């Protein structure tokens, strides 16, 4: 009798253990950890193909922070992505103009020169009041109302191309204007502008962080192909990013097709410095 009683009481306990282990396995798979950072300018949620759009949204939800092209998404989609705990930054090209933008014809007269390696793009005169006003009071207002967590601003490198005081002040005017929306601003590239603003003490009043492409990798635009960065350029960028960090700016890296061993090196570097990085599959940033 005692033996029979022991067998009966043990069986439910065994079932409970099995159920617990299965449940643990299920939730572990379902709640895979998010990636830290991703830049996805080449994808959108408005293709009109429901399954594809849903796949895009799910991809973005798998990151803690993403950069996307706001015109490729609806405010409702941005809210859906954010509901999963993802911070969403919107891309805004302040130093150049692409010929596929609906406002291209209105502003091409303010362009300065073609953008090398980017056939559809032109450097812009950022000192022009009409361009400044459009970025600040039209696009800035429109995009901020979509519920973005911040702006990702491209091509302050215009100051490297045209190192004139009016260009420098024009960029500062645009950044100051965008600050009215109380959103963090991250500058993509623009090391010459960033370092000058650090030197004159205005950096932290203008923007909050920097993203630098190709610290550890580089792009051969003739193919295109993706290679390891040369030592001299890598050392320059590392010194520059240390200056940015010391100035109180957050730092992000975007690399292209870093292989496994190089990715481990970048992981160690970013972990040591407190930076975030994204390993892009291609220039299309999909």
Feature annotation, model-predicted:
Residues 24-32:
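Sec-dependent signal peptide cleavage junction
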